[in-house]
From Swiss-Prot:
<keyword id="KW-0067">ATP-binding</keyword>
<keyword id="KW-0809">Transit peptide</keyword>
<dbReference type="InterPro" id="IPR016064">
    <property type="entry name" value="NAD/diacylglycerol_kinase_sf"/>
</dbReference>
<feature type="compositionally biased region" description="Basic and acidic residues">
    <location>
        <begin position="413"/>
        <end position="429"/>
    </location>
</feature>
<dbReference type="GO" id="GO:0009507">
    <property type="term" value="C:chloroplast"/>
</dbReference>
<keyword id="KW-0808">Transferase</keyword>
<dbReference type="GO" id="GO:0005524">
    <property type="term" value="F:ATP binding"/>
</dbReference>
<feature type="compositionally biased region" description="Polar residues">
    <location>
        <begin position="548"/>
        <end position="569"/>
    </location>
</feature>
<protein>
    <recommendedName>
        <fullName>NAD kinase 2, chloroplastic</fullName>
        <ecNumber>2.7.1.23</ecNumber>
    </recommendedName>
</protein>
<keyword id="KW-0150">Chloroplast</keyword>
<keyword id="KW-0520">NAD</keyword>
<dbReference type="Pfam" id="PF01513">
    <property type="entry name" value="NAD_kinase"/>
</dbReference>
<feature type="transit peptide" description="Chloroplast">
    <location>
        <begin position="1"/>
        <end position="62"/>
    </location>
</feature>
<dbReference type="InterPro" id="IPR055214">
    <property type="entry name" value="PTP-NADK"/>
</dbReference>
<dbReference type="Pfam" id="PF20143">
    <property type="entry name" value="NAD_kinase_C"/>
</dbReference>
<dbReference type="GO" id="GO:0006741">
    <property type="term" value="P:NADP biosynthetic process"/>
</dbReference>
<keyword id="KW-0547">Nucleotide-binding</keyword>
């Protein structure tokens, strides 16, 4: 029935009485091996490559005789029924033989994972340790702690599970009731609780190893595949399967879903299988699906699960056309939305995409919800349109001249208004025919009834997020009513916007005046020249035989101006005669002027309005976020300005169609402490130099400023031998991952090399750095050491001064080395000055392909190429002919080194560029790469370096300000533009 390699069973053999054989009631088998062969019931071991299992049959006989009663009904155990009403996530009930099998599958998979890990760590035969230590030293202990803790937890759970399965839990078997099952762990059967704990451990181990196991390493692949198999058997509920189904280590909760919903058709075994459902797909699972002819995989997971092995195999399969993947993201424990169910139904109904496999993480919650909603969608009732006579159609069309059909067809009303039409008419309909017409369907169309479902009942009761916005509150206060917005939404108050189709204009009066409906309403409220008051209860005003023009109505000089009352329900009230009067034009004109003046006065708040309310008005003053105000012309096209940095995107409406800058892209940055800093890292030049200056600075910081002083371990050894400096602390140089969390700012004593060392010391965020010039050049060190007390006080107490402390955020470059298209572990560097790829000692010119966002831009043939930051522009790049760039400019410099082509000039790229320097396969020789002049290593053919802006800059404290310090360094260190003055004539 099952195999078990659990070592805990071996010492039990000596304590059990032998038996003559296995009961005939247990003589059946189910294929559980990975190669598809049927394995007989019993335990199997291998000794010297010779299988033996007769002695272990005695163990099973003795255990089953003690743990289980003879009337368990093992003869009736068969493959799990296809009835999905049996709560598949619970698993088999306690005492079932399927429960024992599920336990042993987990034991066996865990044993294999443990063996693969131990063999990878250290070969038991040769004693060779084969673990690559390419990752950084500070990450090594964290990884070891995670793996050891997770393995210890798994071992503890396995021992507990073995004891439970071997002791034969008769009490839990008798007390368990399926009706009492809930989500809480205390009400779940023991197997479900055990699987839940094992799942958490496996997922923790997955997260710990996902960044360190790469597909190009065979040993990593073995460990990863064993881990995924253990996860699958933990995800699986534990029911037995048919012989032709994949084993539980490949897919959890594998189950076919049939097209028919009736139990008689399903049990007939002739029913068509619509698709298969189950748990996550792994590398081996994908291989099985392809070999068995599956064409489509539907992934219901909304979360991101990092599995490089599976993703690599999936990309290859997709590129070869072997499989198609459809993403329908659904959150955990949530039901799919209506549009997602419709999309899924369309995929299932397409016979060219079958066979189909649908999966989530475990194949239980989201897949069950999708199957249920899919069946509900497929069995929904179909309604047909009620036939309407031609006469009634003409009557309705004449009554609603510009009804929803014309609007939906796109004649003058935008899509946003179309959505409102369908929503309003859908609520306001009274018959099937009017509903089909008002929702935008053309005559003669027949469709299924709207398929609507609430994916989350709680969220469906939550009002929209903008219900209390300025726009919505203004609409509500102006409406002076409490009725739903779908029935009594007031017309738009701003000229130039297309009114909602609920308020249609169907009348035309003589004349060439442009009349606004709000003006007519005000006239109706105040009365005409004869003193006749128009009714104010009408919710919309229709002008007979009128036509749209930019959201306004062109009126003509008919003797009687008819104003009809349209209630929005397809029926129009009798027109109201309005005698000719000059008050109409005067009222409209005066109202337009008053409204224009009001909008000019409130132009400051116009940016808070939505796009619909920001329409162009002839003769009106408009404003935008650019700060430029001018008169908008109706003939001028509107535009949007979209700003994106490759990560985020913002949209700014430019209503006056004029682009302008309101402020420079970079400004001066000032350092302000929310709380007083307490810890400082004191760095100095290597060797015994500058020890006196370091002692002086440390004493000042500790005794006068009451700060904790940290130094590097080598410097701490020197301080430890000096009396009176026991307050100096240190850190472990091998673990600097959390150093930035302990240090408030850094004080550097030396030259530019100390600042580069500080940049290399912090892998992520870097605290503010104040540097004192005690080196040979000191381009980046703008503070003289003579003023160190004053400068340090300004940094520590910068909040209490009026001028504050200015800092410069110096951009760094993140560099990653790739080999054969795969990232090399531990080969990630943050560069402050430059990265250099050169030919090294090779006699041939280097050939380097340069890509920007995966596009080949050029090929460098020369001694090499430099990619520098603005800070490094005054170093190696300047010597190679590059420009000198202010450190505040967000860019990167691309400078060739002695190029073979004289037309190859240096260029400056934006900081959003993503470069890749690749050594092509046809290059004559390899190349070398160095980062800030250190960590030099060889690049073979096919290797590449990817370069992009680092998230964390290096903040340096200025002596005066950014520009002043930079020009002083140019003059002091590089003698920039130093020459004799020209004599006067």
């Amino acid at each position: 029935m099952f195999l078990c390699f659990c070592p805990c069973h071996v010492p039990i053999m000596s304590r059990l009485s032998p038996a003559t054989g296995i009961s005939s009631r247990l003589r059946f088998s189910i294929g559980l091996s990975s190669d598809g062969r049927l394995i007989p019931f019993g335990f199997r071991f291998r000794r010297n490559d010779v299988p033996f299992k007769r002695r272990l049959r005695f163990v099973i006989r003795a255990q089953l005789s003690e743990a289980f009663s003879p009337d368990l009904g093992l003869d009736s155990q068969a493959v799990k029924s296809r009835d999905t009403s049996n709560l598949p996530w619970i698993g088999p009930v306690p005492g079932d033989i399927a429960e024992v099998e599920a336990y042993c599958r987990i034991f066996r998979s865990a044993e294999r994972l443990h063996g693969a890990l131990m063999e990878t760590l250290c070969n038991p035969v040769t004693g060779e340790c084969r673990v690559p230590y390419d990752f950084s030293p500070e990450e090594k202990p964290l990884l070891e702690d995670k793996i050891v803790s997770v393995l210890g937890c798994i071992l503890s759970l396995l021992n507990k599970g073995r004891k439970e399965i071997l002791s034969g839990r008769s009490s839990s078997m008798n007390s368990f009731n399926l009706d009492d099952v809930g989500v809480a762990e205390e009400s779940l059967p023991p197997l479900a609780v055990f699987r839940g704990e094992m799942k958490r451990c496996c997922e923790s181990l997955h997260i710990a190893l996902e960044n360190y196991l790469t597909p190009d390493d065979e040993r990593s692949g073995i460990v990863w595949r064993k881990l995924q198999k253990l996860k699958n058997v933990c995800y699986d509920a534990g029911f037995p399967r048919s012989d032709n189904y994949p084993c539980q280590t490949l897919f959890a909760n594998w189950d076919p879903i049939y097209s028919s919903n009736t139990k008689e058709d399903i049990d007939s075994y002739e029913s068509e299988i619509a698709f298969w459902r189950g748990g996550q797909v792994t590398q081996e699972g994908l291989k099985w699906l392809i070999e068995n002819g599956f064409k489509t995989i539907v992934d219901l997971r909304a979360e991101i699960v990092k599995d490089t092995f599976y993703q690599t195999a999936l990309d290859d399969a997709i590129s070869l056309g072997k499989i198609t993947v459809v993403q329908i993201p659904i959150d955990v424990r949530m039901a799919p939305k209506a549009e997602q169910v419709e999309l899924f139904a369309s995929i299932v109904s397409d016979s060219s995409k079958r066979p189909i496999y649908v999966h989530s993480k475990e194949g239980v919650w989201r897949t069950s919800a999708m199957v249920s909603r899919w069946k509900q969608y497929m069995t929904r009732p179909i309604t047909k349109e009620i036939p309407v006579s031609e006469e009634s159609k003409r009557r309705e069309v004449s009554e609603t001249k510009l009804g929803s059909n014309a609007v939906v067809s796109g004649k003058g009303v935008p899509d946003e208004q179309t959505d409102k039409v369908s929503e309003i008419n859908e609520v306001d309909s009274r018959s099937a025919s009017s509903q089909s017409k008002e929702s935008g369907r053309f005559e003669g169309d027949t469709s299924a009834s709207e398929f609507n479902m609430v994916s989350d009942p709680l969220k469906s009761q939550v009002p929209p997020g903008n219900i209390f916005s300025r726009k919505e509150m203004s609409k509500f206060l102006k409406s002076k009513s409490i009725a739903p917005a779908g029935y009594l939404t007031n017309p738009s108050k701003i000229l130039g916007t297309v009114p909602t189709p609920q308020f249609s204009y169907t009348g035309v009066t003589n004349g060439n005046q442009i009349v606004d409906k709000d003006s007519i309403r005000r006239l109706a409220e105040t009365g005409n020249s004869n003193g006749t008051l128009l009714p104010t209860s009408s919710q919309s005003l229709d002008f007979g035989n009128g036509k749209f023009s930019n959201g306004n109505v062109h009126a003509s000089d008919n003797t009687n101006k008819s104003i009809s009352d349209n209630r929005g329900n397809g029926f129009s009230a009798a027109p109201i005669a309005v005698p000719p009067s000059d008050n109409l034009s005067r009222a409209v004109g005066s109202h337009s002027v008053r409204e224009s003046q009001t909008q000019r006065n409130n132009s400051g708040s116009s940016s808070d309005s939505s796009d619909d309310e920001a329409g162009a008005i002839e003769g009106n003053m408009c404003a935008s976020a650019t700060g430029v105000v001018r008169v908008q012309s109706r003939k001028k096209a509107e535009m949007f300005l979209v700003r994106t940095d490759g990560v985020s995107c913002t949209r700014e409406k430019v209503t006056e169609s004029s682009l302008a800058f309101t402020h420079p892209s970079t400004q001066q940055q000032m350092l302000l402490w929310k709380t007083t800093p307490k810890t400082v890292l004191l760095l100095k030049k290597l060797g015994q130099e500058l020890m006196e200056e370091a002692k002086e600075a440390a004493s000042f910081l500790y005794h006068q400023e009451n700060m904790n002083v940290l130094v590097e371990p080598e410097v701490h050894d020197v301080f430890a031998r000096i009396p009176g400096f026991g307050f100096v602390q240190t850190f472990y140089i091998q673990d600097t991952s959390d150093l930035h969390e302990r240090v408030d700012f850094v004080a550097c004593l030396g030259g530019d090399g100390v600042i580069l060392h500080a940049s290399n010391l912090f892998k992520g965020a870097v605290p503010p750095v104040v540097s004192f010039n005690l080196g040979s050049l000191g381009f980046l060190t703008s503070h003289p050491f003579e003023d160190f007390r004053q400068d340090l006080k300004r940094v520590i107490h910068g909040n209490n001064t009026l001028d504050g402390v200015y800092i410069t955020l110096r951009m760094r470059l993140r560099c990653e080395i790739y080999r054969k298209g795969k990232a090399m572990p531990g080969k990630v560097f943050d560069v402050l000055n430059e990265i250099v790829v050169d030919r090294g000692s090779n006699p041939y010119l280097s050939k380097i392909e340069c890509y920007e966002h995966d596009r080949l831009i050029t090929k460098v043939q020369g001694d090499g190429v430099i990619v520098a930051t603005p800070t490094g522009s005054t170093a190696y790049s300047t010597a190679a002919g590059g420009s000198m760039v202010h450190p505040n400019v967000p860019c990167m410099l691309f400078t060739p080194i002695c190029p073979h082509s004289l037309s190859f000039r240096p260029v400056i790229l934006p900081d959003s560029a993503k470069l890749e320097l690749k050594i092509p396969d046809d290059a004559r020789s390899n190349a070398w790469v160095s980062f800030d002049g250190k960590r030099r290593q060889q690049l073979s053919r096919g290797d590449s370096v990817r370069i992009y802006m680092s998230q964390h800059p290096l903040p340096t404290v200025n002596k005066s300000d950014q520009t002043g310090d930079w020009f002083r360094s140019l003059i002091r260190c590089l003698n920039w533009n130093e020459r004799l003055d020209q004599k006067a004539l």
